[in-house]
Structures are given as C-alpha cells and as structure tokens.
C-alpha cells in the first residue's frame, strides 16, 4: 500500500501545483504580480552578481535583504491562494468525494479516522496543514510583515530548515511504520486504507 500512497500523493501534488501556477499567472486575480516580478528581478541580480567564495556578503547587502523580504510579501497573495486551493481540494473536495482525492481514487485508497469512519473537517484541516507544510508558509508570511529584513532572513531560513526536517521525518515515519501512518496522520488521528473495488 505504501507505493499506492506515494503514487496518489504525486498525482494530487501535480494536479494542485498546476492549478495554483495557472491562477497565479493571471494578473487580474493577482494584483501584486508586477511588484513581485520587480522585486524578484532585484533579488536575482544580487544573487547573479555574488561571488560564490563570498556568499556571506549577500547577508550584508541591504538590496538583497529588502528584495528578499518583498518577494515574500508580494508573493504572499499567491501563497494564500495556494493554501486556499490546498484546503478546498484536500478538505472540501476529498470530504465530499467519499474521502478520496483524485490520486486516492485512482489507486483505490481513502482517508478514515481511527474508528474507520469519515474524518471530520477539523481532522482534514490538521492533516492538510501538516502533510503539505502549510504551517511553514503561514509562519513565514506573518513574519515577513512584522520583522526587520535581516531578522526575517535568518528566521525564514531557520523555519524552512525545520519545515524540511519535518517533511523528511514525516516520510521516514510513513516508510518504517507497519501501519503506514505518517506524522500528519498521527496528529490528525487519521489513516489511509484500501477500498474494495465495488466501493470506489
């Protein structure tokens, strides 16, 4: 079942990523698109003109610090829209679709709670937040608006490292547990089970 879950995850991730990319490119939907591109250009220029041997110099470069923070700020609209898409798909659609996302439907899987019943919306929200590291995105967006540029850079690096560590730990727990429950399943009180052919 582990391979089926990985396959379902990849299908769902691809589907939702394409959806988010499509929406984020529409200027009418994203009023900060041009400001994001302007700041990203400054950020990229600093990166391109930085000597690899003196990479620590970028942390002293005020243009880099400000442009990096602004990229996150003006990109927050897309990040929030992305989170809404994740929640609508993995909470709303999956709950409505008999606890199956498109990927799970294809591989004959579904999400249940510990009693093997349909999970509550609350459990689905918890599951999605931790499965897709949305807590990292939320925290970084909030900090981008309240911290100074230098403190924000250091904080965002630390938070991203924690996020990646959680992501890898989540995968390892899933691989080595006999019941195939990952950390997000344990936190949300859910598990993924195979569905009989007649009930797909």
What does each of the following model-derived ranges do?
Residues 147-157:
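Membrane-interfacial helix-loop-helix connectors in multipass membrane proteins
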Residues 1-144, 157-200:
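Short, small/hydrophobic-residue-rich motifs at membrane-helix boundaries and re-entrant hairpins
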């Amino acid at each position: 079942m582990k391979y089926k879950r990985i396959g379902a995850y990849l299908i769902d991730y691809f589907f939702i990523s394409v959806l988010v990319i499509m929406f984020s490119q529409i200027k009418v939907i994203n009023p900060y698109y041009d400001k994001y591109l302007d700041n990203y250009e400054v950020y990229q220029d600093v990166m391109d003109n930085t000597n690899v041997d003196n990479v620590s110099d970028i942390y002293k470069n005020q243009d880099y610090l400000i442009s990096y923070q602004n990229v996150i700020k003006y990109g927050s609209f897309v990040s929030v829209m992305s989170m809404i898409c994740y929640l609508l798909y993995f909470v709303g659609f999956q709950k409505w679709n008999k606890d199956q996302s498109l990927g799970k439907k294809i591989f004959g899987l579904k999400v249940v709670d510990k009693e093997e019943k349909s999970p509550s919306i609350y459990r689905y929200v918890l599951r999605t937040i931790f499965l897709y590291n949305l807590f990292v995105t939320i925290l970084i967006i909030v900090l981008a608006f309240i911290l100074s540029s230098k403190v924000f850079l250091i904080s965002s690096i630390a938070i991203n490292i924690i996020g990646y560590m959680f992501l890898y730990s989540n995968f390892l727990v899933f691989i080595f547990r006999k019941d195939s429950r990952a950390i997000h399943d344990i936190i949300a009180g859910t598990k993924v089970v195979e569905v009989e052919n007649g009930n797909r």
